[in-house]
């Protein structure tokens, strides 16, 4: 039987690691489109800045063909290079298009009419057509310019530093559009705005050279539709990853943006590894996970076998990305999502509610994460030299915080927005303290301040120094955190007898049992079955420690 299981494991792994051909193998040729890419051999900043605006206009033109936009994009991303002729050779590796280089000496004054070099393969009709395309912006582009500020195009640019600042400001916006061009291109642009704000703060993006949102959308659409451009950008990302600490501004910028692009489309796979395998909690031993654990093992081996380009499977439209879809390991994916929703607040931004999400295993992950938050990794604890008392203290601290209680502060957790002096007094004001009833399915196994059915929560006594009702509402955040300790179940009718107990530093902390039938009051039982008499004259000390901490 063991041989069959080993054969099954080996078979599962080999399914993922099938022969895909050599890395440099040439696929069967298909029809290729001719793409004209413009090359400027001079470092003249005025000419290059004019070419920058020309490429932006071609991309945004409403009558430009796809090949026109592809050539304009490759030219745009090559403008910072000192040798554009050599840099554009990166695009020659693409089997999707035939790249034609057109050397340009400049533009006619006041127009976007190209002045080709003698070696350029451009006819007079093509030059006139490009000039018309540059002036044919769609009506959705305001002020006849792709920029937000209408006077940006006409500004002189006679210094290399000026050109680089403007060029990098435009290119960084184009790179940000690459981040979501394949995975969530139709989603709201909140993430793009946050990245723009980040690069403005870093000084890499000047706000004056911001493009209009419509121009940014057209750039993203052109990149999404062109595999040639995305293959070219992948080579740029790989070059940026190989750079050392002493790099130029452009590749430092590309390397930074590349962190947002890497492993896009593989989020479910990496989150499953992080929250299912990374936590190493006991539910992984479930027999239902055995087959899917073998699947994850084969996928990790496949990712390593794909090499450096594995990070850009979505950008390259690689078919191998389908192997990493969470539909191939739904149970352990559901468990990992349950763990992640408890441990990571950023999981709220991830759409994990897939049709194959198993609610049962998702709940297993949620409950496991809640129970295991206070556990201590013995190996790490041994490395730190923690004593058993210190390990117990850490566990108790996490348990207290998980129940919504602060570390020794009555009334709630520590609020960083309120000074410590104000935190010593609860800020919530109560008019009526209702009865607190525990649900039948809550066993109160985490050591929280629970009560049996019919037990009433302690309340502040009226008047005196500890009268919480006369305290001003000092902070709404602290009040919101304090109120869940006494959840409102139902209001107590006026004709029924009830009593307000004293808490916090008093000699007696009596828990009353509320009798709905109007009978005489009975002794209440706490969370561990301890009996608390209702007679306030008896000198009985409360054994529910949560109210004393």
Curated annotation (Swiss-Prot):
Entry binding sites for RNA:
180, 195, 260, 350, 354
Alphabetical UniProt keywords: Capsid protein, Helical capsid protein, Host cytoplasm, Phosphoprotein, Ribonucleoprotein, RNA-binding, Viral nucleoprotein, Virion
Q: Which residues form a coiled coil?
A: none
State the Gene Ontology terms under molecular function: RNA binding; structural molecule activity
Q: Write out the ranges of the annotated region (Ntail).
A: 401-549, 405-549
Polar residues bias locations: 531-549
> Where does the record say this protein resides?
Virion; Host cytoplasm
Q: Name one GO cellular component term.
A: ribonucleoprotein complex
Q: Where is this region: P protein-binding?
A: 1-398
Q: Where is the composition biased (Acidic residues)?
A: 437-447
Q: What is known of its domains?
A: Ncore is globular and carries the regions required for self-assembly and RNA-binding. Ntail is an intrinsically disordered monomeric domain in the C-terminus.
Described by its record, this protein's role is as follows: Forms the helical nucleocapsid (NC) with 12.71 N subunits per helical turn and a rise of 5.3 Angstrom per N subunit, protecting the genome from nucleases. The encapsidated genomic RNA serves as template for transcription and replication; encapsidation by N is coupled to RNA synthesis. Forms the encapsidation complex with the phosphoprotein protein P. Before encapsidation, the newly synthesized free N protein, so-called N0, is chaperoned by P.
Family assignment? Belongs to the paramyxoviruses nucleocapsid family.
What quaternary structure, including any partners, is listed in this protein's UniProt entry?
Homomultimer; forms the nucleocapsid. Binds to the viral genomic RNA. N0 interacts with the phosphoprotein (via N-terminus); this interaction allows P to chaperon N0 to avoid N polymerization before encapsidation. Interacts (via N-terminus) as N-RNA template with the phosphoprotein (via C-terminus); this interaction positions the polymerase on the template.
Q: What is the name listed in the Swiss-Prot or TrEMBL entry for this protein?
A: Nucleoprotein
């Amino acid at each position: 039987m063991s041989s069959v299981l080993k054969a099954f494991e080996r078979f599962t792994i080999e399914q993922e690691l099938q022969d895909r051909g050599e890395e440099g193998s040439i696929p069967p040729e298909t029809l290729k489109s001719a793409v004209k890419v413009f090359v400027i051999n001079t470092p003249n900043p005025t000419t290059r800045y004019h070419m920058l605006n020309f490429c932006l206009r071609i991309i945004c033109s409403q009558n430009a063909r796809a090949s026109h936009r592809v050539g304009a994009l490759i030219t745009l991303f090559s403008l910072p290079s000192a040798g554009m002729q050599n840099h554009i050779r990166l695009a020659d590796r693409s089997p999707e298009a035939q790249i034609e280089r057109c050397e340009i000496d400049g533009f006619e004054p006041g127009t976007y009419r190209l002045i080709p070099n003698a070696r350029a393969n451009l006819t007079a009709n093509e030059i006139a057509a490009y000039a018309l395309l540059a002036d044919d912006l769609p009506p959705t582009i305001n002020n006849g310019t792709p920029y937000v500020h209408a006077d940006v195009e006409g500004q002189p640019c006679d210094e290399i530093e000026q050109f680089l600042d403007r060029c990098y400001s435009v290119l960084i916006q184009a790179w940000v559009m690459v981040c979501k061009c394949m995975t969530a291109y139709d989603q709201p642009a909140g993430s793009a705005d946050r990245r723009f704000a980040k690069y403005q703060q870093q000084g890499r993006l000047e706000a004056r050279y911001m493009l209009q949102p419509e121009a940014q959308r057209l750039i993203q659409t052109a990149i999404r539709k062109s595999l040639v451009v995305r293959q070219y950008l992948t080579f740029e990302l790989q070059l940026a990853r190989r750079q050392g600490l002493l790099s130029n501004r452009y590749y430092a910028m590309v390397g930074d943006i590349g962190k947002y692009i890497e492993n896009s489309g593989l989020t479910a796979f990496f989150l499953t590894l992080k929250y299912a395998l990374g936590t190493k909690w006991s539910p992984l031993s479930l027999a239902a996970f055995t087959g899917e654990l073998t699947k994850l093992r084969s996928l990790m081996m496949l990712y390593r076998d794909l090499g450096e380009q594995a990070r850009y499977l979505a950008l390259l439209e690689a078919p191998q990305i389908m192997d990493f879809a969470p539909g191939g390991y739904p149970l352990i994916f559901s468990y990992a999502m349950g763990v992640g929703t408890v441990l990571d607040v950023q999981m709220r931004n991830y759409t994990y509610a897939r049709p194959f999400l198993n609610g049962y295993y998702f709940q297993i992950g949620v409950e496991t994460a809640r129970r295991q938050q206070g556990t201590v990794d013995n190996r790490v604890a041994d490395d730190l030299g923690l004593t058993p008392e210190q390990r117990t203290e850490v566990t108790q601290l996490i348990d207290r915080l998980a129940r919504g209680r602060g570390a020794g502060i009555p009334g709630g957790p520590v609020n960083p927005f309120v000074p410590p002096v104000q935190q010593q007094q609860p800020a919530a004001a109560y008019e009526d303290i209702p009865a607190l009833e525990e649900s039948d399915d809550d066993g109160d196994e985490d050591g929280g301040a629970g009560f049996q059915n019919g037990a009433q929560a302690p309340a502040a006594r009226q008047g005196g120094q500890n009268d919480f009702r006369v305290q001003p509402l000092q902070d709404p955040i602290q009040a919101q955190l304090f109120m869940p300790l006494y959840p409102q179940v139902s209001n107590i009718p006026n004709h029924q007898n009830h009593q307000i107990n004293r808490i916090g530093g008093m000699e007696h902390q009596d828990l009353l049992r509320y009798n709905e039938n109007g009978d005489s009051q009975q002794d209440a039982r706490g969370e561990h079955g301890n009996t608390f008499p209702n007679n306030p004259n008896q000198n009985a000390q409360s054994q529910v420690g949560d109210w004393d901490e």
